[in-house]
């Protein structure tokens, strides 16, 4: 697919598919496609769950209701096993994270040329359809979790308790306060960074592999045939990847918030 109607080189093809539809420059650049798809999928998630919740019956449930109930029960069981405090927000938060991240990841299942080609017909030169291949989106999610970690740490332990946790662990001596503060600060900051980069790295790599496989179709019939097999194999494997990454993001969020609720 070409952005301007001319044939793209392999390098140009890859670069084109990895470029966001954006406005602004530098720090103030807005990735319009990532924002639209992430918000749109979030609204779709809310609409589906709200519709199923309103139509839920005690009789024989439909297929969609069964699926939703399975997801809710799975997330609820995960929260009960992992979160040791009492907070009615955690289970809905975990459900939202798991389903929303999975839906954003699932956009990677759409063949790489389909939506960008349609966008090109509408005059849109660039379009990335997988929000979690944008590090800005994954960091936004992780920063939201980080804010909750800080909030509940202070709410449960108090300001003084939170400060003591940062300055008197792991070495409980006033002389070791600078060392403790450094170690605990690094540990605290590493949580959102690891959350964001793990999700971004796995999905970005998966998207890149799909793009490389798509290049094989423009070579010759033998490479195109091989590409079909590779694409099918990677598609099956990638279903596991996108599900696992959504699960890991959810579980780490629960673990971090459980740690924030521990009052030493």
Curated annotation (Swiss-Prot):
It is a multi-pass membrane protein. The chain crosses the membrane at residues 29-49, 90-110, 111-131, 134-154, 177-197, 208-228, 235-255. GO terms for biological process: proton motive force-driven plasma membrane ATP synthesis. One of its GO terms (cellular component) is proton-transporting ATP synthase complex. Keywords: ATP synthesis, Cell inner membrane, Cell membrane, CF(0), Hydrogen ion transport, Ion transport, Membrane, Transmembrane, Transmembrane helix, Transport. SUPFAM superfamilies: F1F0 ATP synthase subunit A. The keyword NADP does not apply. GO terms for molecular function: proton-transporting ATP synthase activity, rotational mechanism. Key component of the proton channel; it plays a direct role in the translocation of protons across the membrane. F-type ATPases have 2 components, CF(1) - the catalytic core - and CF(0) - the membrane proton channel. CF(1) has five subunits: alpha(3), beta(3), gamma(1), delta(1), epsilon(1). CF(0) has three main subunits: a(1), b(2) and c(9-12). The alpha and beta chains form an alternating ring which encloses part of the gamma chain. CF(1) is attached to CF(0) by a central stalk formed by the gamma and epsilon chains, while a peripheral stalk is formed by the delta and b chains. This is ATP synthase subunit a. The lineage of its organism: Bacteria, Pseudomonadati, Pseudomonadota, Gammaproteobacteria, Alteromonadales. The gene is atpB.
């Amino acid at each position: 697919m070409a952005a301007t109607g001319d044939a793209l080189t392999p390098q140009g093809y890859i670069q084109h598919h990895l470029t966001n539809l954006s406005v602004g420059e530098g720090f103030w650049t807005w990735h319009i496609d990532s924002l639209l798809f992430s918000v749109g999928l979030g609204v779709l998630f809310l609409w589906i769950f709200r519709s199923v919740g309103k139509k839920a019956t005690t009789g024989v449930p439909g297929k969609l209701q069964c699926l939703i109930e399975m997801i809710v029960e799975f997330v609820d069981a995960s929260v009960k096993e992992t979160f040791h405090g009492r907070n009615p927000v955690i289970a809905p938060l975990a459900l939202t994270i798991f389903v929303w991240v999975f839906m954003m990841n699932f956009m990677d299942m759409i063949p790489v040329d389909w939506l960008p080609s349609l966008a090109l017909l509408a005059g849109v030169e660039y379009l990335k359809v997988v929000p979690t291949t944008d590090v800005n989106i994954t960091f936004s999610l992780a920063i939201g979790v980080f804010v909750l970690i800080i909030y509940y740490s202070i709410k449960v332990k108090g300001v003084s308790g939170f400060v003591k946790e940062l300055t008197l662990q792991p070495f409980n001596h006033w002389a070791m306060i600078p060392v403790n503060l450094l170690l605990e600060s690094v540990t605290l900051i590493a949580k959102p960074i690891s959350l964001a980069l793990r999700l971004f790295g796995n999905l970005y790599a998966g998207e890149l592999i799909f793009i490389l496989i798509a290049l094989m179709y423009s070579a010759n019939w033998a490479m195109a045939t091989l590409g079909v097999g590779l694409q099918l194999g990677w598609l099956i494997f990638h279903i596991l990847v996108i599900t696992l990454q959504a699960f890991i993001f959810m579980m780490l969020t629960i673990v971090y918030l459980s740690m924030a609720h521990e009052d030493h």
